[in-house]
Amino acid sequence: MNPQRKKRLFLILGLLAGVAVAVGFALSALQQNINLFYTPTQIANGEAPLDTRIRAGGMVEKGSLQRSGDSLDVRFVVTDFNKSVPITYRGILPDLFREGQGIVALGKLNAEGVVVADEVLAKHDEKYMPPEVTKALKESGQAASGAEAKP
């Protein structure tokens, strides 16, 4: 193998290694930023991964909201009318958060089956519900009042 060919080979191998490293970094960054949506039924059935950031959504069960008297800790239960999953959250809930209405919580599922949320999103008017929640409710055979998703 002559020296010029050897030089080209090393250059091509170096470029391929650089591209592979760049693709690896890009995939790693994308994987960390993906938040997949899971219904309470999927979470209860063990389909949601533990200690990975997920979005859990459904209707807040009536009578399930428990506020701590001395901190901002809140605990409530979200249901898709098939199964339910408890959610804990530390912070101020959105003004539109109410029992019996649709929410999406972003957080991690722990080993006890509780979603530890770091963000809670509530629907923004009476007729809107997140598309994922609407789909989950339709699949469970329930229909929420005024739950048509609008862009």
Swiss-Prot record:
Membrane topology classification: Single-pass type II membrane protein
Cross-referenced InterPro entries: CcmE, CcmE-like_sf, NA-bd_OB-fold
Entry's localization field: Cell inner membrane
Binding site for heme: H124, Y128
Periplasmic side: 30-151
Cytoplasmic side: 1-8
Alphabetized GO MF terms: heme binding; metal ion binding
Transmembrane regions listed in the UniProt entry: 9-29
GO CC terms: plasma membrane
UniProt entry keywords in alphabetical sequence: Cell inner membrane, Cell membrane, Cytochrome c-type biogenesis, Heme, Iron, Membrane, Metal-binding, Signal-anchor, Transmembrane, Transmembrane helix
Pfam families to which the protein is assigned, alphabetical: CcmE
Gene Ontology BP annotations: cytochrome complex assembly
Protein purpose: Heme chaperone required for the biogenesis of c-type cytochromes. Transiently binds heme delivered by CcmC and transfers the heme to apo-cytochromes in a process facilitated by CcmF and CcmH.
Family listed: Belongs to the CcmE/CycJ family.
Listed name of the protein: Cytochrome c-type biogenesis protein CcmE
